[in-house]
């Protein structure tokens, strides 16, 4: 972990294979130890983590706040409805208010792309040492979700050593609304970095063909890709093409709130063509795990009985794994500024 080089975590395009290994290894150590009640880790004692969520959130916000508290950090939550934004205060001034209060990390979620990056750049220019962690921005990125999905898959394939090597050579199918999904974009960066081949499945209006080249060019603002060899991305139009040979399947929520008018007019037709069921998963040719980043539209992207089948569904496991992954990210960001807390040396 000594090679960690990210003050801010804004996306996964800039992550190297070593970065993924650092996060997954540390998260696995956190997952394997009790850290509630009196046994909280003192790693971030005296630090302040502020969650600035300008979009609704259940899982992500709660998970970050639990993660911070389990590392003994203080937590300050921001709610737009009761803030000075309604009085005309700018988003940057709101962020600076929390910096002035002593925030060490700002976890920022916003409906517009690049807002966390803009805040990070503004704070850097003014010499502030506060770190920014992207909790999801527009259609761009959701790095902690991509990492927890990666860890969930790695742990499923190799419970004792859930590292990037467990993903190498796997065929991972992602079904549904890729166009509007920052989760899908983060998963593309993470999965291909670890050597998985990703198959995207959906209608052209939700899975444009140009996604096949999504990870081929160097990430924006970088001269080269930090990952030497990536897996491939394929786009197909039917589940009959996508599922045979799959090692895992992820389905995505239809984000109707982000869709332009008439982009998708018939939910029943979508379920008929792309909804996952026990019967359809038989096309994989073997038992495979099912993931969904939530929230789930039962009866649209998948059948309710499939979601409740814990021999297949890893959805609740994804939620559980979100806490140790976010603990790992907060710890690594704190370690960027100072030496890691020696209490972690005792973790198995």
Swiss-Prot record:
- InterPro entries on file: Asp/Orn_carbamoyltranf_P-bd, Asp/Orn_carbamoylTrfase, Asp/Orn_carbamoylTrfase_sf, Asp_carbamoyltransf, Asp_carbamoyltransf_Asp/Orn-bd
Biochemical pathway = Pyrimidine metabolism; UMP biosynthesis via de novo pathway; (S)-dihydroorotate from bicarbonate: step 2/3
Matching entries from Pfam families are given as: OTCace (PF00185), OTCace_N (PF02729)
Protein name (record): Aspartate carbamoyltransferase catalytic subunit
Q: What is the lineage of its organism?
A: Bacteria, Bacillati, Cyanobacteriota, Cyanophyceae, Synechococcales
Q: Which residues bind carbamoyl phosphate?
A: 59-60, 109, 142, 145, 294-295
Keywords for this protein: Pyrimidine biosynthesis, Transferase
**Family statement drawn from the similarity comment of this UniProt entry:** Belongs to the aspartate/ornithine carbamoyltransferase superfamily. ATCase family.
| Reactions accelerated catalytically | carbamoyl phosphate + L-aspartate = N-carbamoyl-L-aspartate + phosphate + H(+)
